[in-house]
Amino acid sequence: ALPMIDILLKNFENPDEVRKFEKGKFELVKLPSMTIGRATYKPGWKWSDDISPLSGTDFCEVEHLGMVISGSATVDFQDGKIHTVKSGDIFYVSSKPHDSWVLGDEEYVSIHFLGAEDYAD
């Protein structure tokens, strides 16, 4: 059992784990009851190109809850409609297979409160 903790401070400048891949990285900070992730993707990053080979699935099958810090990206459920998430947006994405890619020439940064543990693992 964990000792009672009144406050626990973590910082992405000193993450507990970093998963690096082509055109980006995923940093994790681990708390007793949850893991929070910070995704940083360079322009040109695409899930199906950069993460698919690491995950063994064609598209992302992780459920997400997060917030976009900067830049913008897509969520594509392969059903014809492509959704856009941009700076300031809070997003929920189901585990239904989806692709994603960075839009434009700005780095995309997002924080993940759900699904971080399983991402790019």
Outline where the language-model segments fall.
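A short, N-terminal "cap"/entry segment at the start of jelly-roll beta-barrel domains
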Residues: 1-40, 48
